């Protein structure tokens, strides 16, 4: 009889690196131009007035101002930057 268990294979035992998605600047906070407002996978939230969208669907500020979230067309969420 074997006195050690066989080193069987396993399908588990690994983990992916964190992606740090989500809102980075909350509604009502003051941001400067170029500040990342939120990181997302796909366009869950769309850019509104004075907000731009990056290649990876990151939404960022185009001007200095205050972040506001609202429901846009077809009840889709949008992010606007109001000038201060």
Curated annotation (Swiss-Prot):
Pfam families: Ribosomal_L27 (PF01016). GO terms for cellular component: cytosolic large ribosomal subunit. InterPro entries: Ribosomal_bL27 (IPR001684), Ribosomal_bL27_CS (IPR018261). Keywords: Ribonucleoprotein, Ribosomal protein. One of its GO terms (molecular function) is structural constituent of ribosome. The keyword Plastid does not apply. It comes from the Bacteria. Residues 1-21 are annotated as: Disordered. GO terms for biological process: translation. Disulfide bonds: none annotated. Belongs to the bacterial ribosomal protein bL27 family. This is Large ribosomal subunit protein bL27. The gene is rpmA.
